[in-house]
Regions:
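Conserved catalytic scaffold of divalent metal-dependent phosphoesterases
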Residues: 1-88
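Conserved beta-sheet core of the metallophosphoesterase superfamily
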Residues: 11-13, 18, 23-30, 75-138
Length: 140
């Protein structure tokens, strides 16, 4: 889920990013259901062929629903992002999920905060490199 990484003097939160998208209420409900312990136990009892069919169905359904949602719902909620900065006591977050590759530099409570968003693996694959005390977001 969430992982704290220390890069020299930098404390970095690495997260999937879906928990930052709190305006997408339908997705958050789905996420809660699909990650429920009971749901996971039942799913793990199924054979691989059935699991693959379910995953394929859900992927297709998700793609269709995503295409029908407004862009602002599909992006992070800035208040939630600020809550994560506070909760994890960091000023750097690296995440995916939204697939909107970018480096966001914002001010919050008088300090600079950075959010590195990785791109979609199919359309704009990217990765993070840390060298010379700098974090870089690069294209593959």
């Amino acid at each position: 889920e969430n992982y704290i990484l220390y890069l020299d003097d930098k404390k970095v939160l690495v997260t999937h990013g879906d928990l930052l998208c709190t305006d997408d209420i339908d997705y958050q409900k789905f996420r809660k259901f699909i990650r429920n312990k009971i749901t996971l136990k039942i799913f793990n009892l199924l054979n691989n062929k059935i699991k693959t069919k379910i995953a394929s169905f859900l992927r297709g359904k998700s793609k269709k629903l995503t295409s029908q949602k407004p862009d602002d719902i599909m992006d992070v909620n800035n208040n939630t992002v600020n809550e994560f900065f506070d909760k994890f006591d960091t000023n750097i977050i690296i995440h995916g999920h939204t697939h909107r590759k970018n480096i966001h530099n914002t001010k919050y409570m008088g300090k600079n905060f950075f959010r590195y968003v990785l791109g979609d693996w199919h359309n704009s694959p990217s990765y993070i490199v840390y060298k010379n005390n700098k974090i870089e977001l690069l294209d593959i």
